[in-house]
Amino acid sequence: MPHHTPLASAVALAIGSLAVPAFAADANDHLDTVVVVGTHRSDVTALQSAAPVDVFTGEKLQETGASDLSAALTALSPSFSFPQSPQGAFAGSIAQGASLRGLASDQVLVLVNGKRRHTSANVTRQGLINARGAAAVDLSLIPLAAIERVEILRDGAAAQYGSDAIAGVINIVLKERDDGGNAGYRFGGYDKGDGLQRKLSGWKGFALPNDGFLTLAFDAGSQDPASDTRDDNRLFYPGSTSINTPREQNNRYRNWRWGSGNVSDQYNFTANAEMGLSEGLSAYGFATYAHKNTDAENFFDPPTTLRNNYGSVALARYPDGRLPVTRYGLEDYAVTGGLRLDDDTLGHFDLALNYGNNRVDSTDRDAINPSWGNASPSTIYTGRREADQTNLTLDWTRDFANDWLFKPLTVSAGLAWRQENYDLTAGDAAGWSNGPLFNTVDPITGRRIPGYYSGITQVDAVSLDRRVIGAYFDVEAQLTEQFQAGVAVRSEHYSDFGDTTNGKLSLRYDFTPQIAARASASTGYRAPSLVQSGLSSFSVQVVEQPPGSGNWVEVQQRTLRADSPEAALLGGKALKPEESTNFSVGLVWQPLPNASLTLDAYRIDIDNRITLSDQLPSSVVRPIFAGTPYANIQSAAFYTNIIDTRTDGFELAGHYQLDLARWGRLDFNGGYAHNNTRITGLDDVGSIPGNQIIGRNTQGLIEDGTPEDKLTLSANWLYDGWSVTVAQRRYGEWQNRNAANPALDQTFGAQWVTDLDVSYRFDLGLTLSAGAINLFDSHPDKLEGAQLYGVPKYSITSPEGAQGAFYYTSVSYDF
């Protein structure tokens, strides 16, 4: 039997695509879907729009075999990026951000049913450029069972939707069903036997008066941790000389693993409803709720480390060492209500009010504050992060018929008011305060006893708010049968940094019914999130200064608020909005009603890009802070606007549907995205050079931290109850730069990933499915020189495959 490699699978799939007149494709209903995002016209499909729009139906999302929306979109869209490598105890284990076109995860706007979605309260500070320093929208909190389709606008849209829409817009459209339903269960795990996943999901539609509907949906489940690290072969106990002693070998932590978090429980709910009130007037509403607990393991402290770093109290508490675990408890909810009025004379009005809240509580287990001695608790609540947002919007659209245009002129206008709040609440005093033993000499070790600093302190606690008032005006015209144009302008006033106005021009010309060209130019902006404006954190160490002097002092490592007095001494300033310009040009080819091919090229320039600085060392910080109240700050980081970037790229998307008559139907889909981001400006901050504020590693994350290109290919065969989907992805090269030594930079090679999903639907509505994500157990390149105890073999910036192959089976029932 021949052995089929991932490359061979991709070649075979590509050859199959070439056997038909165009690139591969979805079904006709996908090509003919009227889009909501990016236009106010009611007669525009994805292929007829003046900007590139992808539409992925709920069925296509389910066929990927993915467990959540972010992973499903990663499989389908070459422009969408969502690194799925283990995050350990980092904030990414509770909420990871996704991105478009290689930009940051907070540079894409997320809508639900066309309404702005609130962001996470968490800011991810680890080494993912699409998450580092960003407070993004958590897409995993909306169940796949609730989704009718997802629309992705790959174009700047701040003039249409406001802040954040620099890379594009993701609009999640919920199901609208007045009857029927589905219930299903899925079980799966990695080929190593870990990461077991269980998920129950379903939806149900109910009829409401006056042709109304209520659709409820949910999913609930859990996932065990997964890891691909090696055993810890250190000597654990003080005085040990061999790892082969019974005490060393029998330590229960010998096989500890650093990896993905253990999702002990997660459940998500949605409700979507609309009901007619009178002629032309209807009321609508939708809501989401999510709860998730994630246990994220830190690095193991063996007894020797506990004794040396925390003292005899810690060693007595944990004689066999400790594996600290941070539990993140997430609660998220959003409610939207509104009225729609359709009047032949006045036009279409949409009045909506929505509120969204995201909060994350964190607790450390197996903790200890040595300075509290035996009074230190083992479980320490380390604080709450909470963000909420209220939006009040009034939108109006009217078509004006006239004799000099091919179709009526579509005019839209609107008003928007938004209130944003962000709160940091301090945790237990044991997590941040110095007890009576602080800085005293440990009678057993002879070392100074440190404190314990974790989570949010009283110094970090903050409550921030701001208000935004905006107005927009939009005109779209089908000037002739071949030529359409659109102009949009939006002005907003922010209570914390003033006014901004942005515009957009979009054009499209159809040379023939099969071939069209499109282009757009726009300006955009992204206001700094309150999370970025308000973040402050610190850790404290007791060190001997100067070494050998016997003079022990407390020194601080701080992340400073950008507008704080401490940051000002380093040259820091209050954050200002990012500003962008976006140019794109594209071609659309539809040789057949069921086939299409699009090509779009773009350039995105971003000025004042918001970035979390590197941790500045004591050699830089201490001379500046000498003689000030901040003299004990030894190293510091803060958010800053000192870099400008340019992103160039192009995207190719193709679709084809092949009717096989009595043998069913084949749907092909292909896409390719290439982008290149470069830093075009890097300013100094006060007396500190810019390349120290944003060092080599961070610069590398921005420029080379994501794959330079991505290819997606898929084929779906539908026949007499059978559905078979084969999908192939290729991630291009990417790089990790060493912070100090270019010789230690590592370039990671291209990676192929193959998925398979097979399902059969019985006549009674029962469907059985089985499949694999990463069928051939593909892995990214291993990290060079980092194969230490418990440390992952693969970079946390790896796009996919660090855990290997994932196999699953599911059962569902339609009723």
Regions found by a protein language model. Give the residues of each.
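Extracytoplasmic beta-strand/coil segments of soluble accessory domains associated
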Residues: 74-121
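Outer-membrane beta-barrel transmembrane domain signature of Gram-negative proteins
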Residues: 314-316, 322-335, 344, 355, ...
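Transmembrane beta-barrel wall of Gram-negative outer-membrane proteins
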Residues: 179-182, 192-298, 302-320, 324-344, ...
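N-terminal periplasmic accessory domains that precede
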Residues: 69-76, 98, 111, 137-140, ...
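N-terminal periplasmic "start-of-domain" segments of outer-membrane beta-barrel proteins
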Residues: 33-64, 121-132
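Gram-negative outer-membrane beta-barrel transporters
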Residues: 413, 590, 596, 600-738
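C-terminal beta-signal and adjacent terminal beta-strands/loops
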Residues: 120, 676-677, 728-737, 759-815
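Short acidic/polar hinge/loop motifs at secondary-structure boundaries
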Residues: 115-154, 202
